[in-house]
Amino acid sequence: MTTDMQPIHALLLQTLQEHRFATSHQLTRLTMHRYGNRRSAIRQTSRHLRELHRQHYLVRLERRIGGWQGGSGVSIWTLSTKGVRHLSGGSRRVRPHHHTTTFLHHSLAVTETRVTLHEAARQFHRDLEVQVEPHCWRRHLDGHGAAITLKPDLAATVTGDEYVDRYFIEVDRDTENPARVITKCWRYLQHQRSGEEQRKQGVYPAVVWLVPHESRKQQIATAIASEPGLPKDLFTVTTMAELHLLVRDGPAPNT
């Protein structure tokens, strides 16, 4: 990365390198603590994004996606080929317009999770560390010695005055049958039983299924509770609206 780039420009590029896609609103919220007020944050972030776009570091996707700012036209930002090469030093080309709406939905939901975690950590005066893909992935050996990669969407560590909470986070968009969720739960249990994470961190993280609404929460919680052999205290199901409570209070039992 060139040394003459503004720190805020470098931060915006790094965020998009980690998450691939983010809306203007998400990027504003993520950097809002750098500004005096919300209006200034919106104005300054928009200016920085326009400048990075003018310099061809970013691509703006204008798509109408329901659930993001009321389904209106949303400015979705991603790195251009120049932006990717600037950060990586490689020669890879990118084709951001080739991604499906389903993929964009999930990517934006993961970005939203990251932003909400940071907002809650600042609100409740917690220290927060977030790992994104692929850094949050975990490798271990199964019972036959074959290598397996567990792929959470995020890993997070929340540190308060007297505790440390660790999480693997699965961002659910209510697009999969609950049976596939249960299959992923068994993969987490297999990873827990390998002991790899406990040897490195001392404890195994709580697995959080982050869902879009209350009815999906009840559906997934019921599926987990009904599955024989799954340790119920390993999994927490919560909605995006409740995510700040996870940062403040830690994992709550499923009800």
Question: What does each model-identified segment do?
Answer:
Residues T31, L49-H53, T113-A121, Y188-E196, ...:
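Hydrophobic, Leu/Ile/Phe/Ala-enriched alpha-helical segments that form helix-helix packing faces
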Residues L13, T175-T183, R193-T255:
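Non-catalytic C-terminal interaction segments of nucleic acid-processing enzymes
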Residues T81, P134-C136, V158, R173, ...:
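Short, flexible loop/turn elements at secondary-structure junctions
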Residues R85-Q131:
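Amphipathic alpha-helical dimerization/coiled-coil segments
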Residues L104-T111, V115, E119, E162-Q198, ...:
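Core beta-strand-centered patch of the WYL/Sm-like small regulatory domain
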Residues M1-H97:
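Nuclease-adjacent, charged terminal/linker segments that flank catalytic cores
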Residues L61, F103, R122-Y167, E176-W186:
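Active-site metal-binding core of divalent-cation-utilizing nuclease and nuclease-like domains
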